[in-house]
Amino acid sequence: VFGGSPADNTTPFFFNGAMDTLKPFLDDGRLTIGSGQDDFDTVSTLRWDQATAQKRMEDLITSTYSGGSKPLDGVLSPYDGISRGIITALDNAGYGSTIEEGLPVVSGQDAEIASVKMIADGVQYGTIFKDTRKLASQAVEDASAYAEGEEPEANDTETYDNGVKVVQSFLLE
């Protein structure tokens, strides 16, 4: 399990959502985290850095997976750059160059071009595409409302508490 940068306020939302989804499977033993590393502080990846993720995966392969000789089915990654670091470490350890050749399933997010190509080549399992056109459209609507002295639209008035106040947000689907 890998997490995003601890300095990014969205990182805990992804991590907690993923762990909440995986919890029943971890609890009943259908899934295991070989390293036992499942807390946010341990799995987070400072600055979403690919090289940092690759180094952590190399260390996990050495310490938990006998240098690549123990099976590993998959790795949860919250960002395509982190995913590419993980995949490089797995490939270098001999797990295979593609999923078909034994490379563990690695998730991702942001649909970066390099990762989309890796998906097409059978290397990365998947990614999440967030349509920035929708984000830009909503941002323009909100900025226009604010410029006209109106309240920008918010569809979440409870989730994002920054410790000082709850920040109203518009969550895209």
Report residues per predicted region:
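A residue-level marker of the well-folded mature domains of exported/periplasmic proteins
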Residues: 1-173
